[in-house]
Design a protein with these regions (language model features):
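CBM-like, beta-strand-rich accessory domains located in the C-terminal region of large
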Residues: 1-174
């Protein structure tokens, strides 16, 4: 979230951002692994966001897992309070994957996947574990050499956190 503009410089500082951003990289069974997270939603929702990515050695497949976690007692109490405010419908969240403007993406397999055609002719497919809603939405691409943003698309996984641990698994493969 941005603060009110400074009265002299008109700059807007980022506030309420993450304070703790752990990152770890290493080897996975079939390639490389990245694990990271942040606590930006801790004070507002009691949730820590963690992400695990694995990339196969041949570069043809990437799997991911996003997690929203209420870990300690105070965090669980904060999450319970936010969950109660939703009348137990769940805390809404979106996971967004922004695509380059040159990627031609379409919803495929009856809404279970997104197929992406690259200019090179390669086809990549995004799939998820089926526990949340998958959609394709309009987005923008900011390019340093252009004065205006370019139209693009973004893959969006939408869901509701109902428990102290919410997991969303997805993959991107050729």
């Amino acid at each position: 979230r941005l603060a009110e503009p400074d009265r002299y410089t008109r700059e807007e500082a980022l506030i309420n951002g993450p304070r703790h951003v752990p990152v770890e990289m290493g080897e996975a069974d079939e390639g490389l692994r990245f694990e990271g997270g942040h606590d930006a939603y801790l004070s507002s929702h009691g949730l820590t966001h963690a992400r695990r990515l694995e990339l196969t050695s041949d570069g043809r497949s990437r799997t991911g897992e996003d997690m929203l976690l209420a870990i300690e007692g105070a965090e669980k109490r904060r999450f319970d309070k936010v969950l109660s405010a939703t009348q137990l419908k769940g805390v809404p969240f979106d996971i967004r994957f922004h695509l380059h403007p040159d990627v031609d993406a379409t919803v495929d397999l009856g809404g279970a996947a997104i197929s992406m055609a690259l200019k090179s002719g390669e086809i990549w497919v995004f799939r998820h574990d089926g526990t949340h809603n998958l959609s394709l939405e309009a987005g923008v691409y900011l390019e340093g050499t252009r004065l205006k943003p370019r139209s693009a698309q973004q893959i969006v996984l939408t869901g509701y956190a109902m428990n102290y641990a919410t997991r969303v698994r997805w993959s991107l493969s050729k």
